[in-house]
Amino acid sequence: MECKTKGKHQHSLNLLDKIKNMKELEEMIDVVLIAEEEKFPCHRLVLAAFSPYFKAMFTCGLLECTQREVILYDITAESVSVILNYMYSAVLEINNANVQTVAMAAYFMQMEEVFSVCQNYMMDHMDASNCIGIYYFAKQIGAEDLSDQSKKYLYQHFAEVSLHGEILDIEAHQLLALIKSDDLNISREESILDLVLRWVNHNQALRTEHLVELLKQVRLELINASFLRQALRRNTMLLCDGSCIDIIQNAFKAIKTPQQHPSNLRYGMETTSLLLCIGNNSSGIRSRHRSYGDASFCYDPVSHKTYFISSPKYGEGLGTVCTGVVMENNTVIVAGEATATRLSRQKSKNIEIYRYHDRGNQFWEKLCTAEFRELYALGSIHNDLYVIGGQMKIKNQYLITNCVDKYSVDQDNWKRVSPLPLQLACHAVVTVNNKLYVIGGWTPQMDLPDEEPDRLSNKLLQYDPSQDQWRERAPMRYSKYRFSAAVVNSEIYVLGGIGCVGRDKGQVRKCLDVVEIYNPDGDFWREGPPMPSPLLSLRTNSTSAGAVDGKLYVCGGFHGADRHEVISKEILELDPWENQWNVVAINVLMHDSYDVCLVARMNPRDLIPPPSDLIEEDGDHRGQR
């Protein structure tokens, strides 16, 4: 059977090769296609075999059935050449310059396979310089998938798209439709006004007549008054039309006196920094409308609003979230272990690393895996992830390790880098000025075999990726673990935890309300305002704190060492300038437990709203100041 299959394949190749030779030698030619006055001799049978359009043409009994020459209108000669080459050689030669014309020809000839290849090529090669052309091309021919994908890309990257020359060539009605939309991902309305003025100036003689209509769609009351004055000085055409002058004068009045009903904000203007309490258990958030057991709590400390995002534990994702980090480009990363179902299908247990898509898809996808360990820290610098220390199983023994592995997101590979100066587990890591700082944790002790096998660490270790080198910096006053850590105004805040004063020599440990603040420039620690009560992080190697707009927030935690204690559902705020803790929210719609607190810039439109019945029941969930 295998021999027959191979024989059929070779038979097909031989047939294709012979037909191609016949075309090149112009043997048995029975039709000539003409496009842009260029002639293409070929065979009706081949055309009809690949194209339903030509099959219908040659079998319908009309004039084309007997004509030797067939003129193709509105199709380029290059696209006909490319498609004929595909028919006769199975090679489709498309590139950025010809893909749209080839796609148009394939659409015209009803060649779905070729059109699909062109469509996928355009999706894969879409960027800010060409997405607008792809969008209007797709709309023109009715390619819904391509139109939807290019529209999403255009709207999401509009700030960058507006700086490219392609957008200056669109029609007035097309620009008008774009700038009417609330869904543009721009943070400042100034960029819309700038685009309108550049578009008009690109061909002022023909486009000035559209200025008033376009200007009405610019939300001028959202623009800085000084920017608007500069625009007037630089574009005298705004002063040559009475309607333009009226629009701008009304805008200045609106800027000075905020309206009762201000203009709608565009999508990008709503993006803000949120506290994300990632991970959850099956209890804690129940609603009569739906179960929120598969969602994670989010909180906007500025507006005091609650949102939810899908949890990485949902479905076939992670069974356990161990820790997480937000990268420099705002990518949200979590690491943990696979679900029991997936583990049963895997040969080995790994660290599973997932990332979140915050626009359009709203789901978690697997990024990579790493050699399994527990109680590790996860850090990031630029576009690299670092799995640091932890506890590994070596020859059936669990040992605390000092190894550090780096994952390059760009290159999709792992590399072992310089190890920690000591073995560590249950430690924390933060990034300041492109350097990693590893804080506290456990380290094994061998000197006193009759005592605890592990000692708490008060060390602060700094890693410089440019040197691949660790340095020990000034130690903390307390040796500790189960604390929270965050960076505020380039300083490291270490909050609460379990620990003891000085180096751990076996002295009594206690729950801490202590705040220690490290200044990297001066390499010194200072004492911060004590927390309202001793507080432990929810996980031994993850933080329950994050910084937003120069303020520090702690989202829940344990008030004691009892692991069965219910989470505190308060959010604490520390303003470094006031040097005082405030409770800014109580009874928040948080799960009974979560895994790691992260801070990322997200848009509320992409998030899940809170259940209305719980908002009604817990009317004070937004808290009090």
From Swiss-Prot:
Record keywords, A-Z: Kelch repeat, Repeat
Keyword Repeat appears in the UniProt entry: yes
Pfam families listed in its UniProt record: BACK (PF07707), BTB (PF00651), Kelch_KLHDC2_KLHL20_DRC7 (PF24681)
Domain BACK: 131-233
Kelch repeats: 384-434, 435-490, 492-545, 551-601
Residues forming coiled coils: none
Residue intervals of the BTB domain: 29-96
SUPFAM superfamilies according to UniProt: Kelch motif, POZ domain
Superkingdom of the organism of origin: Eukaryota
PANTHER family in alphabetical order: KELCH PROTEIN, KELCH REPEAT AND BTB DOMAIN-CONTAINING PROTEIN 12
The name this protein goes by in its record: Kelch repeat and BTB domain-containing protein 12
Classification of source organism: Eukaryota, Metazoa, Chordata, Craniata, Vertebrata
